């Protein structure tokens, strides 16, 4: 049976949309798109318009709409605007309505748009004439990643004008279908999602997807409710299916019942966005007097503040003053309040707030509690419940409490169901890993003590002081050395960071001191909460003094000025370094309890464990490592220095509701060896020798080579995280040299494909996953560090150091560094040779690079006969916003040119700006 062609799939898709009451319209080119928009926009706004929109009025409308970024266009789309008519009257117009029955739905296909190149778009869905959803199709058997890459090409070359109003992209090959939000930035495949049913079962077939996702009432909800404008990052975010189902379930619960409920969404699944969106929607309901979003104080002080203000700018009040909360409660116009559990508990107990708080005693108030099992909440729950007699409480948790792991008070075990009632929706860790919304775990258990008995047997507690054994100098030194020796292999040469969880403050301080005695180049620090009235008997040092000492070392390491008096600022700085927000990161952070729950960091990939953990505490701690980042982070790595195997199995079984945890814990070393060897054999069937790639004339063969070598490298990436990995092993059937030779051919094809050409190539849309190929050790930061450490006081050694740096520059395959090689070599030859110390290296390099930037801009401007200052301004705007408008560039070119020549010049300017910015970023 022959494959269904892309054209046949397209026709079938359009016929399905016709059945769903989308009207097919012929739009052959961009001009036709504009004309259709005019007709549909007038029809949609007809009840508000007495007369047709005039040409001058259209000019005003297009001045509002065009030349804006994707993010700005999304804001315009959602706002009403005032059109001043030629007769002086004013009318409020809008682009679409939340009621799907009031909108006009159309579908068109094969629209040709001329940008840098001529592109033809597969299927466009229009709402009231605006292209809001773009669908790109591939024939069956083709990876839908290629459709994502095709969208990126179109964005770069021709998605301008009204196409900036595209909100969602859909990609499909008929059997696999995903959706993702538009962006001014490069699109990430990891942010393309499958749609599912309520039970998290994927709906991948294009026809079924159309019936469910593109139902007119549903797609309007996705556009109006479930696409979020992130004000901080200036990007669009579209919610995942399980988030949508949870919000819908809670809205039904709040509007149709008075019962409490909770949502079980695994750690890392985006509960904060789900809970905040629920609060936002319920706050618009006139039957609900207040919606109060409760968080723990420490959450509000850290990352949750940032998250909330992304979703709604200025939504969070970070003060600890209860009178501010009382003022917000009194304000009838303030429907949504974000506050802490502590402030709310104070407000209902203190007499001075009694009048304000009593006004809501018998009103419908909804409380939404993010991470509903924070320790403080249980203690304050009763006071709040007692006061608000008609309140509903909705909780969110990634690790619910059941009989087996709940908090026991007397003879009663407090469970999540007891506190919040029924679970309305669940999305478990196995679901999240399957959807690649979080990573699986690679867990290693390292034996650190010998003996003919079970160290985890509780009956031994009286006979043996296990705590003393765990704290022995020999054992702790063994563990510290093991961490130092293996850390770089585990973190891809320091590309990622780690947390080391230990059992007590005493253990933390002791480990910290042991690390200081070992020779290494890692940045290691610690953090803990100290007791104000601590019993210091039997201790050499009060824990606050220990922390002060650790902070002092931290200040020397990073040039900061913290102390225990500025603990919050120290906490924030450490948090930023573990998240990779600072130039100089932290390699290992030692903690007792802090950072083990609720802390999200994509660059955090390793957890070293020397403490007892079980159930929710265990999964929460492990889950710090499993945030999806990019291809170079295939899983979270857990290194256990205690026997937590059974406890790990128990926790994963409980929170996945299954005895089968195979998808959660990744297989062992031998599995990846076998997979690597399988891919080597497959690769050699395509290209027996590296040189065989040079003689490949057929692009389909080149594509097979690229895809196979890419997959081989992914298995190698996983292998390299295992302690036992070595290319010299007999178990591997490819040597390191042979791998590097094949890799050079892969990079050759990548380089050839990346060069912009009008020639259509099957490689254009292949995902090369180039970050997998980078030798991250030799990157810009590494080279600059080598330059800073040149021996300027020894001329002979200085010459050797400079030669070594040039050799390293010649060996790099890091794309960012490759763009800077010529600048760095020139800096070494012209500036560094004349320096006598490293004191001014950074300032000297910045001056040198800025001059190189200026010269490059002037040279290009001279070649193209354009104004250099104009070019500099456009580059500055692009560096700030990340967006470029070709129409704006065209308008700023003053010299008269024929249309085609001006278009060609604009394309060259756009290419120069992109390459220039990439080079100097």
Each model region followed by its residue ranges:
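Conserved RecA-like ASCE ATPase "motif II neighborhood" in helicase/translocase motors
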Residues: 336-369, 374-383, 591-593
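Catalytic cores and motor modules of nucleic-acid processing enzymes
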Residues: 15, 53-54, 259, 284, ...
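A short beta-strand element within the Helicase C-terminal
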Residues: 591, 596-620, 636-640
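Conserved C-terminal RecA-like helicase domain
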Residues: 467-591
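Conserved helicase ATPase motor motifs in RecA-like P-loop NTPase domains
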Residues: 266-267, 371-374, 387-406
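ATP-dependent helicase/translocase motor core
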Residues: 2-290, 299, 303-314, 332-335, ...
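Interdomain helical connector at the RecA1-RecA2 junction of SF1/SF2 helicase-like NTPases
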Residues: 405-497, 512-521
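Conserved segment of the helicase C-terminal RecA-like domain
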Residues: 624-654
């Amino acid at each position: 049976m022959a494959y269904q062609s892309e054209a046949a799939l397209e026709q079938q898709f359009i016929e399905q949309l016709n059945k769903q009451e989308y009207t097919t319209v012929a739009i052959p080119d961009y001009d036709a798109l504009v004309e259709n928009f005019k007709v549909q926009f007038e029809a949609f706004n007809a009840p508000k318009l007495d007369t047709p929109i005039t040409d001058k009025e259209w000019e005003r409308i297009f001045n509002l709409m065009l030349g804006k970024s994707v993010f700005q266009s999304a804001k315009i789309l959602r706002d009403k605007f005032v059109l001043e008519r030629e007769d002086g009257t004013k009318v409020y117009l809008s682009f679409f309505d939340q009621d799907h029955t009031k909108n006009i739905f159309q579908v068109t296909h094969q629209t040709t748009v001329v940008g840098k190149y001529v592109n033809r778009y597969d299927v466009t869905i229009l709402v009231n004439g605006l292209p809001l959803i773009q669908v790109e199709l591939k024939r069956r058997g083709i990876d839908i990643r290629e459709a994502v890459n095709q969208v990126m090409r179109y964005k770069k070359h021709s998605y301008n004008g009204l196409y900036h109003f595209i909100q969602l992209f859909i990609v499909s090959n008929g059997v696999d279908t995903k959706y993702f939000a538009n962006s001014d930035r490069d699109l990430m495949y990891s942010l393309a999602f499958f749609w599912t049913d309520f039970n998290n079962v994927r709906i991948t077939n294009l026809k079924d997807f159309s019936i469910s996702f593109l139902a007119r009432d549903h797609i309007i909800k996705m556009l109006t409710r479930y696409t979020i404008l992130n004000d901080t990052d200036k990007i669009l975010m579209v919610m995942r299916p399980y988030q949508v189902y949870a919000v819908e379930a809670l809205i039904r619960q709040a509007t149709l019942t008075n019962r409490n409920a909770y949502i079980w969404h695994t750690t890392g699944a985006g509960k904060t966005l789900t809970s905040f969106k629920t609060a936002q929607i319920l706050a618009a309901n006139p039957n609900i007097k207040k919606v109060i979003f409760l968080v723990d104080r420490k959450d509000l002080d850290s990352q949750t503040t940032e998250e909330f203000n992304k979703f709604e700018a200025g939504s969070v009040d970070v003060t600890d003053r209860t009178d501010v909360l009382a003022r917000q409660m009194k304000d009838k116009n303030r429907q949504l309040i974000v506050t802490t559990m502590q402030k709310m508990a104070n407000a209902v107990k203190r007499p001075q707030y009694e009048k304000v708080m009593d006004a809501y005693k018998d009103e419908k108030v909804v409380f939404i509690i993010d991470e509903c099992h924070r320790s403080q909440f249980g203690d304050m729950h009763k006071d709040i419940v007692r006061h608000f007699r008609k309140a509903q409480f909705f909780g969110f948790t990634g690790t619910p409490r059941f009989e087996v792991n709940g908090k026991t008070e007397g003879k009663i075990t407090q469970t999540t169901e007891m506190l919040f009632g029924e679970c309305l929706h669940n999305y478990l860790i196995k679901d999240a890993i399957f959807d690649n919304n979080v990573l699986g775990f690679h867990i290693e258990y390292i034996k650190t003590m010998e003996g003919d008995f079970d160290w985890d047997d509780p009956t031994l507690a009286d006979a043996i002081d296990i705590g003393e054994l765990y704290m022995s100098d020999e054992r702790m030194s063994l563990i510290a050395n093991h961490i130092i020796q293996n850390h770089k292999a585990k973190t891809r040469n320091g590309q990622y960071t780690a947390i080391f969880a230990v059992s007590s403050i005493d253990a933390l301080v002791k480990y910290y001191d042991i690390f200081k005695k070992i020779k290494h180049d890692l940045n290691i620090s610690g953090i803990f909460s100290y007791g104000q009235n601590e019993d210091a008997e039997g201790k050499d040092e009060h824990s606050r003094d220990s922390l002060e000492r650790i902070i002092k070392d931290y200040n020397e390491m990073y040039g900061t000025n913290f102390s225990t008096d500025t603990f919050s600022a120290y906490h924030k700085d450490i948090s930023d370094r573990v998240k990779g927000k600072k130039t100089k990161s932290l390699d290992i952070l030692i903690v007792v309890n802090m950072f083990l729950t609720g802390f999200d960091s994509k660059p955090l990939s390793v957890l070293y464990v020397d403490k007892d953990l079980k159930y929710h505490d265990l999964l929460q701690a492990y889950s710090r490592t499993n945030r999806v980042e990019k291809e170079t982070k295939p899983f979270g790595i857990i290194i256990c220095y205690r026997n937590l195997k059974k406890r790990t199995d128990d926790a994963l079984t409980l929170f996945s509701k299954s005895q089968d945890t195979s998808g959660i814990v990744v297989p062992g070393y031998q599995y990846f060896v076998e997979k690597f060897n399988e891919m080597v054999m497959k690769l050699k069937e395509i290209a027996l020798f590296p040189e065989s790639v040079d003689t490949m004339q057929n692009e389909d063969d080149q594509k097979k080579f690229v895809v196979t070598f890419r997959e081989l490298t992914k298995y190698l990436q996983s292998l390299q995280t295992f302690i036992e990995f070595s290319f010299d092993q007999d178990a591997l059937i490819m040597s390191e040299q042979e791998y590097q030779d094949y890799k050079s051919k892969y990079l050759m094809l990548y380089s050839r494909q990346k060069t912009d050409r009008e020639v259509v190539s099957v490689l254009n849309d292949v995902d090369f996953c180039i970050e997998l190929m980078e030798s991250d050790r030799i990157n810009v930061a590494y080279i600059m560090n080598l330059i800073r450490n040149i021996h300027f006081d020894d001329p002979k050694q200085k010459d050797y150091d400079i030669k070594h740096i040039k050799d390293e520059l010649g060996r790099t395959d890091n794309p960012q560094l490759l763009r800077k090689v010529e600048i760095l070599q020139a800096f070494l030859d012209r500036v560094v040779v004349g320096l006598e110390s490293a004191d001014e290296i950074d300032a000297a390099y910045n001056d040198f690079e800025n001059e190189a930037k200026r010269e490059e801009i002037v040279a290009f401007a001279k070649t193209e006969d354009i104004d250099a200052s104009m070019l500099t301004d456009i580059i500055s705007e692009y560096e700030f916003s990340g967006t470029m408008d070709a129409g704006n560039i065209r308008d700023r070119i003053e010299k008269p040119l024929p249309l085609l020549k001006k278009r060609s010049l604009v394309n060259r300017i756009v290419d120069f700006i992109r390459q220039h910015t990439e080079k100097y970023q």
